[in-house]
C-alpha cells in the first residue's frame, strides 16, 4: 500500500536568488534520503514561494524493503583456535554485526575458507523512517544564513511552520524548535492561516489564501498576463529570463500591470532607461512592434487586482525618480572634459597595495602596445589602442556611472563619441569590460579585445605580485573570471601568442608604480583556466596538453580536442606508447649535446635521425597528430635494434640527443608520456 507524503517548511521571506536552488535541493535531498533508507516511491514534486519550500512524494511505500546482507570475516584458520573453538577475532567480528557465533558459516573463496554471516533486517514502517525528515531539512545548504532570537543554531531565515502529512495524517516532528502540524500561512496581506487537508490538497488549499505554490504555475501566469497586455496595448514586452526568474520568486500571487512615464525621458540613452527599469526596479521593458522603446513598463504585483490603480501610480512615481536622476546626470556629464576626468583618476585607488587607477591604466597601456604588435594590428588599430588605453576608465568619475555602476564602459563609449573620439576608441572603452561573466559576450573588435586583454593581464599580475592570490573558493577580486576572459579572448581571436613568452616579456617590463612578481604562480593560474575551458576532456589528455611546450591557447584547446578524437581510433595506443617511450628517455638527455651522425651504428638510428630532422608539424592539431603517429614504426624499429643506454657514453648521449630532438617537436602538440593507454 502506498501513500503520498507532503513536507512544507514555512519561513520568513527568502532572498529571490535562493528560492529556486533551494527548491531543487530539497527535492534532491529527499530523494537521497528515501533511497538511503530503502523507502520506494513513484515520483517527487517540489514547490516554492518566497515564504515556503515544499516537497511531495507520490506513491510512497508504507514500509522499507527488507535487507539481507552477507558479510565476509576472517579466514577459517584465524577464526578457529587450536582446539577448534571460535577465536576472539571471530567473536569480535560477529559481535560487530549484532550477531553471534551461531550465525557463522564457512565459504570457500579462491581455495581458502572464510567466515561469513548473513544479516537479515526487517524493514521499518514509513512513519519510523520519516522521523528523519528534520535531518533532511537541516542538511540543506545556503549561501547565507542567520541566527534569530536567542537560538544557537542558524538557518537561511527564521522558521515559522512545519507540515509533514502522510496521506491525511499529520506526523509529529520537530525542527529547530518548531513542532509540525498541518497549518500553513497564506498570503502575507490577502490570506490567513489555512489547514492543509491532506498531501494531495496542498496547492488548492493554499490557492484559497492567495498562494500559488507551484513556481512554474506562477511563471505561466506572469507570461499569460503579459501576453494579454501585449495584445490589448499593441506592444511587445522584453522578457529577460533572469529577471522573470527573480520576479516569480518575489511573489506568491502574481498580478501583472503596465505603467508609464513621460516621453521626455526617451531622450536619455536607452541603456540608462533599461537599467533603471530592469536592474533597479525589476520592471520589464516595453517596446512598440518595431522594437522601439515605449514610455511604459510592466511590473508584477504580489497580490490581486484590487486597487491596482494605486499600485500603478506608486510604481510610476518610484521609476520617475530614477529617470530624473538619469536625465540629470546625462545632461551634466556632457559638460565634463575627458582629460580632466582622466587626470582625477590619479586620486582614485585601484587597490591600496597596488596603487591608483592611473597607474593601473599606464601599465595596461604598455601591455596593450605590446599585445597590439604581437597580434599584428594595423597602424590605425595600434593608434586606437594607444588612445583608448589613455582614457578608458574616465567614465568611472561621471555622475551617471556613480549612480548606475552597471553602465561603466557603456556610458564611457557614449561620452567618448560625444566628445569626438574615434569610434574604434569608444567601442574599446565599452568592450574592455568583456566578458563580464564566465560565458558572457566577448569583445567584437580587435582594438577592444587588445584593451580587454591588457586590462585583465595587469589586474592579474598586479594582484599576484602583492600576494593577493585566490585560494579555494575565495576570489574576492574575481581574478579567475578575469583570467578566464583572457583565455577566451585569445581563443576566439585565434591570436598565436604563446602565453609563457608573453608573461615572460611582461615580467621584463619596469614600472615605477609596481614590480610584477610571482611569475610561476601566474603561469599555473592561467593553465588552470585553460584546463577549465577544456571541459570534460579526459584528465590525462588535459595534463598532456598542459605539459606540452606550446602555450598558445587556441592551439592547446585544439590539441585537446584532436587527442580526444584520436583516442577513439585503433592506432592510438601503439602510437602513443612509442612516443611515450621516446619522451621518457629524452628526459635523461644532456641538452648541450648535439646529434652527431658519425656516431650512428645502425640504419634505424639513421632513419630516426632523418625523420627527426625533416619533421615539420603543420596544419591542424589533427594533421600534426597524424604526422606524429605515422612515425610509430620508425620509433619502434629504433628501439628494437638500438640499446639507447649504451656503455659508450658518447654513443648513449648521442642517442638521447636524437630522441630529445624528436621529442622537442612532438612536445609542441602534447607531452605524450602523460597520456594513459591502459
Swiss-Prot record:
Identify the main location.
cytoplasm
Its Gene Ontology cellular component terms are:
cytosol
- Where is it localised? Cytoplasm
Q: Which UniProt keywords apply?
A: Aminoacyl-tRNA synthetase, ATP-binding, Cytoplasm, Ligase, Nucleotide-binding, Protein biosynthesis
Cysteines paired by S-S bonds? none
**Record EC number:** 6.1.1.14
A molecular function (GO) term: glycine-tRNA ligase activity
> What sort of enzyme, by top EC class, is this?
ligase
Which reaction does this chain catalyze?
tRNA(Gly) + glycine + ATP = glycyl-tRNA(Gly) + AMP + diphosphate
On subunit structure and binding partners, the annotation says:
Tetramer of two alpha and two beta subunits.
- Name-wise, this protein is Glycine--tRNA ligase beta subunit
Native source species: Streptococcus thermophilus (strain ATCC BAA-491 / LMD-9)
Name the gene behind this protein: glyS
